[in-house]
Amino acid sequence: MIQTQATRTARQELTEVIILAKARKDLSFAQIVDGTGLSEAFVTAALLGQHPLPESAAKVVGDKLDLDADQVALLQSMPVRGSFFDGVPSDPTIYRFYEMMSVYGTTLKALVHEKFGDGIISAINFKLDIKKVEDPDGGHRAVITLDGKYLPTKPF
């Protein structure tokens, strides 16, 4: 039976074990994900404590990272989600996403409502993808796709 977590502690500690094993084995997230049948973004989020993994995927990941049976079971548990428990994020990369939502959040809301009506974009029925592309002006650009199902507000 899939279990739920009441605090962040167990999954945070497992994340530390996973990151150390990933580094020790010199694996990329893409290599860890291979064979799970799931997306790189979803499995990475799960490894960072944000999602439970299905049993088959947890076993694949566990084998690659030499996790024990209890750790594989913990990967399947429903975590306490979210990473902004300490207020405004201080990590520069995460902060830039926070900043993007601070600057463009109201714009996204206005455009979603104008195009779809009153409602939300689901982060549950959701896909995330990130691609590295060449910038014609030199360097690289990140193309990030957030693909969520629109859920209209229903009067009651």
Curated annotation (Swiss-Prot):
Its EC number is 4.2.1.104. CDD domains: Cyanase_C. Keywords: Lyase. The keyword Lyase applies. PANTHER family: CYANATE HYDRATASE. NCBIfam families: cynS (TIGR00673), PRK02866.1 (NF002773). Catalyzes the reaction of cyanate with bicarbonate to produce ammonia and carbon dioxide. This is Cyanate hydratase. It comes from Pseudomonas putida (strain W619). The gene is cynS.
